[in-house]
């Protein structure tokens, strides 16, 4: 139970959602930023694939001088997450139901320049089969959308418990000239953020590795 939040009915959802299915091909409408946040000109942290949204829910409380936007393709989870946010009275947090692979441009194009300063993509669906690789969230087009709107000096934090997923995500960002990898090692040993995701905590408690990397918007 999250402190200050009354119990909500548990929402059961499909673990895997095909982002190429017809129902997910319509891009999200632009946000009315002034209605979504009490202080819309604070720096924005975008969490792509936020699931139940617990990570950004905690981040919004730890970093009240930032705004947080969680994107999730499973609508029932977004409804639940926004209920939690409302119960806590957080005005620097918003969740949006959308397919990130076709919605970043219409969402972020209305942001003032320099507002988007941090992006996280954590433990995305691995889509193990090669024929399903196009369903993985980190595609070259998504990387370019992030490059178009992330402030120079802004960062992208990636992590997964599947090494092949982490490698593919890193390869996609490394292939874009707008990004440079931070650090000299292949993987970060520590999470640079003050909050861990539930999946991260569970994985580490089992003694299993988490593959992390940080990229900076360089030009």
Curated annotation (Swiss-Prot):
NADP as UniProt keyword: no
Positions annotated as active site in the UniProt record: 125
Binding positions for substrate per the UniProt entry: 129, 161
Reactions catalysed according to its record: guanosine(46) in tRNA + S-adenosyl-L-methionine = N(7)-methylguanosine(46) in tRNA + S-adenosyl-L-homocysteine
Disulphide connectivity of cysteines: none
GO CC list: tRNA methyltransferase complex
Any one Gene Ontology molecular-function term assigned to this protein's record: tRNA (guanine(46)-N7)-methyltransferase activity
EC number: 2.1.1.33
UniProt-listed PROSITE patterns: SAM_MT_TRMB
Family statement drawn from the similarity comment of this UniProt entry: Belongs to the class I-like SAM-binding methyltransferase superfamily. TrmB family.
Cross-referenced HAMAP family: tRNA_methyltr_TrmB (MF_01057)
Protein name in UniProt: tRNA (guanine-N(7)-)-methyltransferase
């Amino acid at each position: 139970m999250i402190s200050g939040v009354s119990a909500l009915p548990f929402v059961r959802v499909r673990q895997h959602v095909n982002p190429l299915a017809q129902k997910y091909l319509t891009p999200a409408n632009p946000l009315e930023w002034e209605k979504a946040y009490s202080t819309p000109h604070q720096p924005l942290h975008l969490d792509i694939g936020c699931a139940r949204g617990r990570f950004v829910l905690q981040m919004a409380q730890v970093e009240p001088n930032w705004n947080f936007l969680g994107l999730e393709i499973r609508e029932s989870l977004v409804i639940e997450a926004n209920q939690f946010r409302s119960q806590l009275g957080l005005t620097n947090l918003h969740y949006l139901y959308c397919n990130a692979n076709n919605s970043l441009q219409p969402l972020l194009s209305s942001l003032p320049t320099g507002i988007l300063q941090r992006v996280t993509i954590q433990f995305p669906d691995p889509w193990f089969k090669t024929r399903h690789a196009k369903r993985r969230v980190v595609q070259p087009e998504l990387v370019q959308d992030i490059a178009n709107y992330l402030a120079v000096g802004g960062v992208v934090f990636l992590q997964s418990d599947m090494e092949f997923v982490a490698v593919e995500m890193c390869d996609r960002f490394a292939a874009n000239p707008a990004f440079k990898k931070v650090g000299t090692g292949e993987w970060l040993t520590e999470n640079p953020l003050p909050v861990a995701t539930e999946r991260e905590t569970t994985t580490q408690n089992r003694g299993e590795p988490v593959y992390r990397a940080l990229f900076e918007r360089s030009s």
